[in-house]
Swiss-Prot record:
It comes from the Eukaryota. It is found in: Mitochondrion outer membrane. Residues 1-5, 255-341 are cytoplasmic. This is Mitochondrial ubiquitin ligase activator of nfkb 1-A. GO terms for cellular component: mitochondrial outer membrane; peroxisome. It comes from Danio rerio. Keywords: Membrane, Metal-binding, Mitochondrion, Mitochondrion outer membrane, Transferase, Transmembrane, Transmembrane helix, Ubl conjugation pathway, Zinc, Zinc-finger. It is a multi-pass membrane protein. A zinc finger (RING-type) spans 292-329. Homooligomer. Pathway: Protein modification; protein ubiquitination.
Amino acid sequence: MEDFPVLEMVCLGSSVALSGLFYYIYRKKRKTVDKLKEAPVMALDAKLIDLLNATPGKCLQYVVVEGTVQPVGEPLRSQFQESSVGVIQKLVLREHKLVWNSLGRIWTDSERVLLQRVNAVPFNLLGLNKSFVRVLCPLEATGPKMEIVHEKFHQATYGFTDLIGQYLSGEKPKGQLETEEMLKVGASLTVVGELILDTDRLLKIRPPTDGSEYFLSSADFETLLMEQEGQAEVWRVFACICALAGVAVLIWTGRRYYRQLKLRWEQENLRREFEGMGTGEREEDNGVENACVICLSNPRGCVLLDCGHVCCCFRCYQALPQPFCPICRQHIKRVVPLYQA
């Protein structure tokens, strides 16, 4: 029986590792979804302060608050559009280029971030009757998806010598993409986190102290919940696919192992049968005309099928490098003992 192949070990180990990783991510996402489903949606009004005053510790661990963005002081202004103001600003400069793939013999697209800067100012969520809640640590949250207020692509220019250098280096610059994103003043925002009543009598929402995920979303709560459920389902599908691939590799390997083991059993039984009948025949058949054509010492003791030639002893048959008849070179499908009267 052959050793366990390295390729099958790698495939099986990779499928087990990936399925375990994807299942861990799925369980983490599933836990987040379950916490979101349990989180109460709090109306942002004057009654919220009374509720927190009556709550032990003046804290609600995981709640949903919806409102409109309002800066505490001076808002951020767009560097490219004077009319655009917001509370979070993200400037990104990306380089786009073509890279020569020597394996596929093609040019492939590649990009990398040359510069990224995020600015933020304190802001509140404005609710009913001028009630508001201060949003703390917005850059630590997942989201929000901000509006792109500026996007411009700067095309690369180069001369003849640059072209030669590009083909020698295997990199061909395409240009740079400049983008600016902003969370604008007045935008609707959904925040999921820990709500507290601070010592200054201000409502504040912050990242949960129990490690739960902190969300800022431009969509409503129902859309946010559906997005998280969709992400959890994707990871579950990935985990199932990898697990099924591992099971398939295991079944295929086990089947091949069983076939090899069965063949070994058959060969062992056949060897014992030949040994049992060969002791008496060696004394009777010592003629040259009945000698094995390979070793020329043992008598011919097996019939090679399907060709039917009787030309060798069983030991020499087992020693054949490939199962081909020594006489006609036909493939040997099976071998049976030769019984002589």
